[in-house]
Design a protein with these regions (language model features):
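N-terminal low-complexity, intrinsically disordered segments
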Residues: 1-52
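Short acidic-glycine loop/turn motifs at beta-strand connectors
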Residues: 18, 62, 120-123, 134-135, ...
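Generic non-transmembrane alpha-helical segments
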Residues: 36-40, 44, 90-98, 193-201
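DPxDG-like acidic metal-binding loop motif
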Residues: 61-71, 136-137, 141
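Long, positively charged amphipathic alpha-helical accessory segments at protein N-termini or as interdomain linkers
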Residues: 98-100, 129, 136-227
Length: 227
C-alpha cells in the first residue's frame, strides 16, 4: 500500500493462501481482555497479528483466501464507500458464479460484523473486508473462508470470550459447505472466480513482489506483532 500510494508501484492485487493467524484490529488491542485473547489464539495454534484495517478479530488459515488490493488515489477518503460496495459486490458475484447463494450484508451475530460482509443465504458469513487509507492511496483487504469453518469457530470462541464480544458461532460458514462439487478443488475455483471478476474491470498482469517491497514488509512487520 505504501509504495502504491507513493507512486512507486502500479495498482496491485494479491490473492494468497495465508498462514494460520488471528488478525486483531486496533479496537481489540485496547480492550481489557486483549492479552488473554492473544494467548487464546496462540493456544489454539494460531499466530496473533495486528491488521491494517477492519473492525474486530478475524481468522486466516490455509483454507482461506487473503485478498489485498492497493489502489493509488489522490483523494482516497472520497471513495471509501464505493470501494467497499464494489469489492463486496465483486466477491458476491464471484461466489454466485460457482453456485453459492451469496449476498452482501451483515448476518446477525456474525464475527467481525460489517455491512459489507458476504454471506450465504443470509445465514452464514463467508467473507469480510476492511479498508485502510493513506495519503495518495487506499488498501482494501479481506478474507474469504473457502473451507475450515470449524477452525474459525474453534479459535474465535475463546478469543471473543476474552474480548467480551458477543457472537453466534453458528454464523461462521465456508464456501465449500455451499458447493456440491469437490471441496479439494474449492480454493482454486474460488480464487479463479474472483480473478475473473477483477478481469472484467482491469487488465490483469501476473507479477511478483520485488525485493524492495519485501524489504519494506520486513521492516514494517514488528508493527503488526502484539506487544
Amino acid at each position: 500500500m505504501q509504495r502504491v500510494a507513493a507512486g512507486e508501484l502500479p495498482q496491485t492485487l494479491r490473492l494468497a493462501r495465508p498462514g494460520t493467524m488471528v488478525a486483531f484490529a486496533k479496537q481489540d488491542a485496547v480492550a481489557p481482555g486483549y492479552a488473554d485473547a492473544v494467548r487464546a489464539a496462540r493456544a489454539g495454534g494460531f499466530a496473533a497479528v495486528l491488521r491494517l484495517a477492519g473492525g474486530r478479530a478475524a481468522v486466516f488459515h490455509d483454507q482461506t483466501i487473503a485478498l489485498a488490493h492497493a489502489v493509488p488515489d489522490p483523494e482516497p477518503r472520497a471513495g471509501i464507500h464505493s470501494r467497499f460496495e464494489w469489492t463486496a459486490g465483486l466477491l458476491a458475484r464471484a461466489l454466485r458464479s460457482l453456485g453459492v447463494e451469496a449476498r452482501v450484508g451483515e448476518v446477525p451475530g456474525e464475527y467481525c460484523p460489517g455491512g459489507y460482509s458476504v454471506n450465504a443465504r443470509r445465514e452464514v458469513k463467508l467473507a469480510g473486508i476492511g479498508q485502510r487509507i493513506v495519503a495518495g492511496g487506499s488498501h482494501v483487504g479481506g478474507v474469504i473462508v473457502v473451507g475450515g469453518a470449524e477452525r474459525v469457530r474453534d479459535v474465535l470462541v475463546p478469543v471473543y470470550r476474552a474480548l467480551e464480544l458477543p457472537w453466534d458461532p453458528g454464523t461462521a460458514g465456508a464456501v465449500e459447505n455451499e458447493l456440491n462439487g469437490s471441496p479439494s478443488r474449492a480454493w482454486t475455483a474460488v480464487r479463479d472466480a474472483i480473478l475473473a471478476e477483477y478481469g472484467r474491470r482491469y487488465d490483469l498482469v501476473d507479477g511478483e513482489l520485488d525485493e524492495e517491497t519485501l524489504a519494506l514488509a520486513r521492516r514494517l512487520a514488528p508493527e503488526h506483532r502484539p506487544a
